[in-house]
């Protein structure tokens, strides 16, 4: 990981760079056995604008002031998490969800950085990923998440669901 990565809210003028990052991420996923998680146009322009307008979209900036990654951190209920199959959530406490995390592949440790950022604000973090996304599944588990079960996306696709509960400070 670079020495001085910075996280800031995404601005509308960042969208062209985000589209490049998502294209790179889709190629990476396909080359690593996960060609189906993100459609060629995912996320849509409308989704990107909604994430920005809701204040949920963030970018990671490198020392050279380049956007190297992006993620969504949404606080509050995610409707797709209301029903979980083959398991259960660790608790019913308020949570934030990490979605659409992607990088340009040039900087390591982006997932850990996004999680640390999220944990500065929230004690409960949920995330989900496609069964075939082995790279993300490994990153999730290596960073202390617990596997909780299966959720269904708005389109009916299954996702593996995880939760991280921050330990209280003693």
Question: Which stretches of residues belong to each language-model region?
Answer:
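Conserved acetyl-CoA-binding loop-helix of GNAT-fold acetyltransferases
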Residues: 103-120, 138-142
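Conserved beta-strand in the GNAT
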Residues: 59, 66-77
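Conserved acyl-donor/pantetheine-binding loop and adjacent beta-alpha core of acyl/acetyltransferases
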Residues: 72-106
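A short beta-loop-alpha structural element at the N-terminal edge
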Residues: 5-20
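Conserved GNAT-fold acetyl-CoA-binding loop/helix
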Residues: 26-46
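Conserved active-site alpha-helix within GNAT-family acetyltransferase domains
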Residues: 132-149
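Conserved GNAT acetyl-CoA-binding A-motif
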Residues: 121-132
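Conserved catalytic-core motifs of GNAT/GCN5-like acyltransferases
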Residues: 128, 146-160
